[in-house]
């Protein structure tokens, strides 16, 4: 990164840079789990260990500037980045683990730490490729996922869905992650453009292309929704059927319906303060409407009240990740 002020601001927030374009940061749930004070909803839903999760990204740039994003979308990363210097996948993984260990060093002297978890956390076995930016812009994403799989590590990739050709290539080369997420926050083109502020031409069209190929991608698939209320509401009753039609087209295994949290940079945006945060009951009520509109086999499978997340899916027995799905 060329601009030291941007780098300094992100490091102040807990980010650590790996190579030219990658970053890693310790998740709050990883810290809580090390102290036996709680686990991420993904741990409850899918069986991955929060304390052994590495939250990272190989590419800190994103095409969108979503209004609900807690990341530093106001900072134009493009002018500070040398995109010609592409990081090596193996080196990214090694550096992420190295930085993760450094960030965890302070826990070693904590008398309340779970020693066994701390020991296992030195070699993270779950990589959440979702920290910042859009990972499908990273030209060597397939190699990165393949390296993680070779090491027996699970990988969760979150994408904005604007690069369908990348996903098709990952599918063709058998380099899809353990679990693939596509973010769905708008039920129509008008709402989508207002919500995402994308730099990509025909973003709504490309997003729908991704949804169209989603059913044939050979991995566990999730649609992730973030609900916001107030002047930027994307959880109106009249939107439910449109959401359901979009989800049916994608035919995911699961739908995570999350309540917006006013944290990070999102707090400073108009209409995105604490009043925009739906309660866990409001999230659940809206999830019930979506599940009802989807119809069978979709149903409410689980919930994590603290995180305000509801899981909709087809089969409860398929929630936990099996060894052959890594």
Model-derived features with residue positions:
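Short catalytic/ligand-binding loop motif for oxyanion handling, primarily in non-cytosolic enzymes
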Residues: 65, 75-78, 189, 263-266, ...
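Flexible, acidic/Gly-rich N-terminal and inter-domain linker regions that tether
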Residues: 1-60, 64-68, 72-102
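C-terminal accessory regions of radical SAM enzymes
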Residues: 248, 280-326
């Amino acid at each position: 990164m060329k601009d030291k002020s941007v780098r300094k601001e992100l490091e102040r927030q807990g980010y650590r840079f790996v190579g030219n374009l990658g970053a890693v940061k310790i998740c709050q749930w990883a810290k809580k789990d090390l102290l036996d004070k709680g686990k991420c909803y993904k741990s409850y839903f899918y069986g991955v260990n929060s304390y052994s999760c590495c939250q990272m990204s190989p590419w800190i740039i994103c095409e969108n500037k979503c209004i609900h994003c807690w990341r530093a979308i106001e900072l134009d990363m493009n002018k500070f980045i040398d995109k010609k210097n592409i990081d090596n996948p193996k080196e990214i993984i090694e550096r992420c683990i190295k930085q993760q260990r450094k960030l965890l060093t302070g826990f070693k002297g904590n008398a309340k730490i779970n020693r066994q978890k701390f020991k296992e956390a030195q070699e993270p076995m779950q990589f959440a490729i979702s920290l910042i930016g859009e990972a499908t812009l990273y030209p060597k994403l397939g190699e990165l996922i393949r390296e993680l799989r070779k090491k027996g590590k699970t990988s969760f990739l979150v994408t904005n869905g604007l690069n369908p050709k990348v996903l098709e290539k990952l599918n063709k080369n058998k380099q899809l992650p353990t679990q693939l997420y596509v973010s769905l926050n708008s039920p129509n083109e008008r709402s989508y453009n207002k919500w995402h502020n994308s730099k990509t031409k025909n973003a709504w069209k490309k997003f729908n292309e991704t949804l169209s190929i989603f059913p044939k991608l050979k991995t566990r698939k999730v649609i992730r929704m973030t609900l916001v209320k107030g002047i930027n509401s994307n959880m109106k009753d009249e939107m439910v059927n449109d959401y359901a039609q979009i989800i049916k087209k994608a035919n995911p295994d699961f739908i995570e319906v999350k309540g917006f949290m006013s944290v990070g940079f999102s707090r400073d945006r108009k209409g995105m303060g604490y009043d925009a945060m739906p309660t866990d009951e409001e999230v659940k009520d809206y999830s019930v409407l979506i599940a009802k509109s989807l119809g069978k086999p979709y149903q409410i499978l689980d919930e994590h009240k603290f995180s305000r997340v509801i899981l909709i899916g087809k089969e409860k027995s398929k929630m936990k990740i099996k060894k052959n799905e890594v």
